[in-house]
Amino acid sequence: MRRGKASAALPKDRAMVEEAHTRVRLGWPAALLFVSGTAALVYQVLWIRQLSLVVGVDVHAVSLGIGAFFAGLAAGGWLFGRLADRVERPWHLYAALEMAAGVLGLSVTLALGAIAVPFVWLESRVGPLAWLLPLLLVTLPATLLGGTLPVLMRALRPLIEQRGLAGGRLYAANTLGAIAGTLLAAFCFIPWLGLRGSALTAAVLNGLVAIAAWRLAARASAQAGTPGNAAPPAERAVAPEEAQEARARRARLAVVLYAIAGGLALGY
């Protein structure tokens, strides 16, 4: 009887150990996403401010800035999420995304400061199609930023039982960083540093995150003993075809419901 109780307690103890291990592993990645989220929302505040000067109407600038930014995040999550499953070194991909986002974010900020005259010229000739110019400028760096979370999740490769914990913690850290970025941009960076100085600060933050990610990649490779840090056997197991189809249906339903919820939230 005692032996049965002891054996029953083993899976529970193992689950607790795995959860504690996952929490420890999430420390640095969560910090990276916090800083990355801070930089991302600094850019967004700057771009909305600049777009209001370009298009001349605040509500249009806010709608264009938020719409283009979230379109980029969605495209980046879809594109780089698929790519992350194919690359051998997702940590390096994450570092490259952060570095490229910093360079492109700074470049777009400088470009938005110079497109007022071209925008007016285009609008007088092609009408509403002129809005594609600022839309594309904002969407491109946002696409890179949108790929950071799924790529980092792929780099961590949490156990199936810990994916909810890992995803929730990383998303929360990224959201908290976004809140910090919004407040810092509005109350500190823009008044003290101006638009270009604020964009440069955000780009530096992206660069620091990229450097830290490269160091974490080296540490992960050293611990695993291989450059790719091979995935655990539990993740390589292929589910039966019926289970895969059922999982795909649930995933599609979740995406639709999540999209509706996001649309309602941003509509308010």
Task: State where each predicted segment sits.
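Alpha-helical transmembrane segments of multi-pass membrane proteins
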Residues: 2-268
